[in-house]
Swiss-Prot record:
GO terms for cellular component: chromosome, telomeric region; cytoplasm; nucleus. This is DNA/RNA-binding protein ALBA2. Belongs to the histone-like Alba family. The gene is ALBA2. Identified in a TARE6-associated complex consisting of over 30 proteins and including ALBA1, ALBA2 and ALBA4; the complex binds to the non-coding subtelomeric repeat region TARE6. Coiled coil: none annotated. It is found in: Nucleus; Chromosome, Telomere; Cytoplasm. Possesses DNA- and RNA-binding activities. Binds to DNA with relaxed sequence specificity. Associates with the subtelomeric TARE6 repeats. One of its GO terms (molecular function) is DNA binding. Pfam families: Alba. Residues 84-121 are annotated as: Disordered. Keywords: Chromosome, Cytoplasm, DNA-binding, Nucleus, RNA-binding, Telomere.
Length: 211
């Protein structure tokens, strides 16, 4: 199957998923890509793995005949941090110096400047860690499919699929956003519900049930 797990270059039919973004944005991109390509690749790293699975399931329920291949692997991630421990030690040593050593300081200024320059160049520390990664390949082309491959999943039943166009997905996204905000009259309903539970009538009913 295409889609190497070792390459870091993004392919034209690949969608890299972040756990912070809205899943419907990626679903929209996937449906648009299926108009040009027979298969797409959904990829994610670390916390985004659960988002990759979620997006793949949403796409499979909006497009018919999608065969799925799941790839799990690890890759090295380099973290760069600044090490200021050397500068802190120099600051402590300067505080401990007495007034009798002022004459010696003039002679040591050049040496200290050279040492500080060396420390400034060596302040960056690199850490190499391994992070889990996932790639899910969704394919419409049945001729190039090896159904015995590890990680293969057959298409969903047509009864479970509701085919949608990119325009319909955008409408679904706007509807969900409106529904989350409460829509028309949503704020009034929430305020009514809050006031109802804060009234004495509700408290009296709770007292009667206890007795």
């Amino acid at each position: 199957m295409p889609g190497s797990t070792k390459s870091d270059t993004k392919l034209e039919n690949e969608i890299r998923i972040s756990y912070k973004s809205d899943a419907l944005d990626y679903v929209y991109k996937a449906i648009v890509l299926f108009e040009t390509y027979d298969e797409i690749i959904l990829s994610g790293v670390g916390k985004a793995i659960s988002s990759v699975v979620n997006v793949a399931e949403m796409v499979k329920r909006r497009a018919k005949g999608l065969h799925q291949f799941t790839k799990l692997y690890e890759k090295e991630h380099v973290i760069k941090r600044e090490d200021n421990s050397g500068l802190k030690k120099n600051a402590k040593n300067e505080d401990k110096k007495s007034g009798d050593e002022e004459e010696e300081e003039e002679e040591e200024e050049e040496d200290e400047e050279n040492n500080k320059n060396k420390e400034a160049n060596n302040r960056t520390v690199e850490f190499i860690t391994t992070v889990p990664c996932m790639k899910i390949i969704l394919s419409k082309n049945e001729d190039k499919i090896d159904k015995n491959e590890i990680g293969y999943q057959k298409p969903l039943d047509e009864k479970e699929v509701n085919v949608m166009t990119p325009e319909q997905i955008l409408k679904e996204k706007s509807y969900r956003r409106r529904y989350r905000r409460g829509g028309r009259g949503g704020d009034r309903f929430r305020s009514y519900r809050r006031n109802y539970y804060e009234t004495s009538m509700w408290n009296n009913r709770r007292y009667e049930k206890r007795n």
